[in-house]
Swiss-Prot record:
Gene: aat
Main EC class the enzyme belongs to: transferase
Domain of life of the source: Bacteria
Name by which UniProt lists this protein: Leucyl/phenylalanyl-tRNA--protein transferase
Keywords per UniProt: Acyltransferase, Cytoplasm, Transferase
Pfam families noted in UniProt: Leu_Phe_trans
The species this protein was found in: Vibrio atlanticus (strain LGP32)
Localization of this protein: Cytoplasm
One term under GO cellular component: cytoplasm
Catalysed conversion reaction: N-terminal L-lysyl-[protein] + L-leucyl-tRNA(Leu) = N-terminal L-leucyl-L-lysyl-[protein] + tRNA(Leu) + H(+); N-terminal L-arginyl-[protein] + L-leucyl-tRNA(Leu) = N-terminal L-leucyl-L-arginyl-[protein] + tRNA(Leu) + H(+); L-phenylalanyl-tRNA(Phe) + an N-terminal L-alpha-aminoacyl-[protein] = an N-terminal L-phenylalanyl-L-alpha-aminoacyl-[protein] + tRNA(Phe)
Amino acid sequence: MTIYLTELDTTSIEFPSPFDALDEPNGLLAFGGDLSPIRILNAYSQGIFPWYGPGEPILWWSPAPRAVFNPKTFEPSKSLKKFQRKHNYRVSINQATDRVIGYCSSLRPEEETWLNNDMQAAYRELASLGFCHSVEVWQGDELIGGLYGLQRGQVFCGESMFSLKTNASKIALWYFCEHFTQFGGQLIDCQVMNPHLESLGAIEVDRDEFLSSLRLLKETSVNDACSKKQWLKEMP
């Protein structure tokens, strides 16, 4: 079967409507363009994100349904709370964004990373411009887990997470949900559901609902203090 896709013009940052995305493969919308900050920010503001593998052109996606967290209602399990009381992992914001992106790009067993050098460079540039943020989890002075993503108003678009020690990424998400809510955050976009996200309480919403929420929430900023370098959990 022939697939017809829009090729993005390198002189324009415009995208097709997310409602034009293919059903199969789910959410594929366009190809080409570049990974400039202005294009990526425009994409995320419309519920579109880049994802492509080795040897492929830049591919742009807007899948349906969409996996999301409501940070207000996120509830860590009793076992996770007990684990954290015992281990006292430290948690920070934007203390090691480059390293978090680097760890997230590391190859997983039997998997080729989608987070290639160009993608890493793009997110690092967005971090330097104040749009990409990270959460870090530490055991003492050792970075053991974290997550990163882009913020568009009251929406945090989660990109990737990693764990080098048990429960580290879960703790990153837990503390970030509490922190983001405190500053007015309303929605965390996880893009596509997987068993790990589902186990943490992510839900799926249809494209209409997600894009409607995004259009509304991206227009209201959270306080700048939300993303300043800080510690959410220090050693007792």
